[in-house]
A protein has these predicted regions:
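Alpha-helical transmembrane segments that form the membrane-embedded catalytic/substrate-binding core
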Residues: 141-161
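Bulky hydrophobic segments
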Residues: 1-139, 158-170
Length: 170
């Protein structure tokens, strides 16, 4: 760890380069995960999340807390579990990137900044998915719940960052 961090918790040159590379690779993974057409991924089951509205080639899930509101409309407990798992993975979608950016970018190091930047990242992802649906029929879904779950992930990353920084100061 001494090769990556100085005694005060700041990065060494190698640490900064490593963190920047990891953030770039993870950002690329997010792009591939969020923007490739849905049909490129294996479909484990013919499953549709309840509450989705289709307008032409656009897929929207405008219901806040859809898992709770429409949870009674799924066919099985396993399908409900699949929906909950999707929400959990959305919480952690931006977590690693935000965590790395907190170390790299001083302007990110407040709760207000994390809330703003993470929400904007999430909104960009969702709007880009709509654009891709219009352009190439990617069958992506704009989900209101993704906005708050991704933002919550950013807040959790901020909490972990603060714990680590606090540990260095002890």
């Amino acid at each position: 760890m001494r090769k990556l961090f100085q005694a005060d918790g700041n990065f060494t040159k190698l640490g900064r380069r490593t963190c920047t590379t990891l953030a770039g690779v993870y950002a690329l993974a997010i792009v591939l995960l969020c923007f490739l057409p849905q049909t490129w991924y294996p479909q484990y089951k013919d499953f549709s999340t309840p509450g989705i509205i289709q307008i032409g080639r656009l897929y929207l899930l405008p219901t806040p807390f859809n898992s709770i509101v429409n949870g009674n409309k799924v066919d099985s407990l396993g399908d409900f579990g699949w929906i909950i798992l999707q929400n959990v993975t959305n919480i952690f979608l931006l977590f690693p990137l935000v965590f790395l950016l907190l170390f790299l970018r001083e302007e990110w190091r407040s709760l207000k900044a994390v809330l703003s930047y993470t929400f904007c990242f999430s909104l960009f992802i969702e709007c880009t998915q709509l654009l891709l649906d219009l352009l190439i029929d990617a069958q992506r879904v704009f989900e209101v719940d993704d906005l708050w779950t991704n933002t919550l992930g950013g807040v959790l990353a901020y909490g972990l960052y603060r714990l680590i920084v606090k540990g260095w100061k002890v």
